[in-house]
């Protein structure tokens, strides 16, 4: 019996350690697969409507815009996320009864940030928008598919010389930049689907952990995740929940 127990224990240890010991694709190969997966969606623009929730200092921005405070001090407000590829992402709050000109907004255009004072000065909202743009609004380079992704990750401080495997949201993921337990800049991609699922980086003095959850959901499909979360200090600070995603809507250039 003791021998059987030892064998079972050894098998369990091997199963847990398997991701660390598995074959690792070269980073350029991973990024090429990521680029191909996103390019297969055929997206030039994307509109995602839903609800944004925030706690702490970020909740004040929602309350000032007409949001409601729920249990635990969390504020909530309808919102819209629009993307124009390459490199333009806009988060817009949608208070009831507010005209288009009155709606608070935040725009990330390449590395530039602009928008309403309250949102543009909040590093957590900026980090959420910047990570979304980094992971969902990359251009396609047919000649070198990995290059736009490598450049975007390098801008966020992710080392392109180290990689590992880790587990995220119940699935195995490629971890670019180091080990899964590191708190330095890392980019995570689902091992099987090659969808982006997590980005750790620094926005100003804020250590941001942005998570893209629930790919393939009825609300977002393969175009957008079910939710985008911003964690700081191990706690959830902002969450955008997708209610509807629309591929390639006609969006005015003026909003970007």
Question: What does each model-found stretch correspond to?
Answer:
Residues 97-99, 165-256:
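Gly/Pro-enriched, hydrophobic low-complexity segments
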Residues 57-82, 91, 117-142, 151, ...:
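Subset-of-secretome marker
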Residues 21-120, 159-161:
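N-terminal mature ectodomain segment of secretory-pathway/periplasmic proteins
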């Amino acid at each position: 019996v003791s021998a059987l127990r030892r064998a079972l224990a050894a098998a369990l240890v091997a199963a847990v350690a398997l991701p660390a010991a598995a074959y690792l694709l070269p980073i350029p190969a991973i990024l090429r697969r990521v680029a191909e997966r996103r390019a297969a969606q055929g997206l030039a623009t994307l509109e995602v409507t839903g609800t944004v929730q925030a706690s702490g200092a970020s909740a004040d921005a929602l309350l000032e815009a007409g949001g409601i405070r729920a249990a635990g001090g969390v504020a909530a407000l309808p919102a819209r996320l629009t993307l124009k590829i390459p490199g333009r992402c806009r988060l817009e709050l949608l208070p009831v009864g507010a005209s288009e000109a009155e709606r608070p907004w935040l725009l990330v255009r390449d590395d530039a940030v602009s928008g309403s004072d309250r949102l543009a000065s909040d590093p957590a909202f900026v980090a959420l928008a910047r990570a979304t743009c980094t992971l969902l609004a990359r251009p396609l380079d047919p000649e070198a598919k990995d290059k736009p992704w490598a450049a975007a990750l390098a801008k966020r401080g992710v080392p392109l010389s180290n990689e590992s495997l880790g587990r995220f949201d119940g699935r195995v993921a490629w971890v670019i930049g180091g080990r899964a337990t590191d708190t330095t800049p890392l980019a995570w991609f689902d091992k099987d689907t090659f969808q982006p699922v997590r980005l750790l980086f620094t926005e100003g003095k804020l250590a941001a952990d942005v998570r893209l959850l629930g790919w393939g959901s009825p609300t977002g499909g393969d175009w957008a995740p079910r939710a985008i979360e911003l964690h700081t200090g191990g706690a959830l600070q902002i969450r955008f929940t997708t209610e509807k995603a629309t591929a390639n809507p006609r969006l005015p250039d003026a909003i970007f």
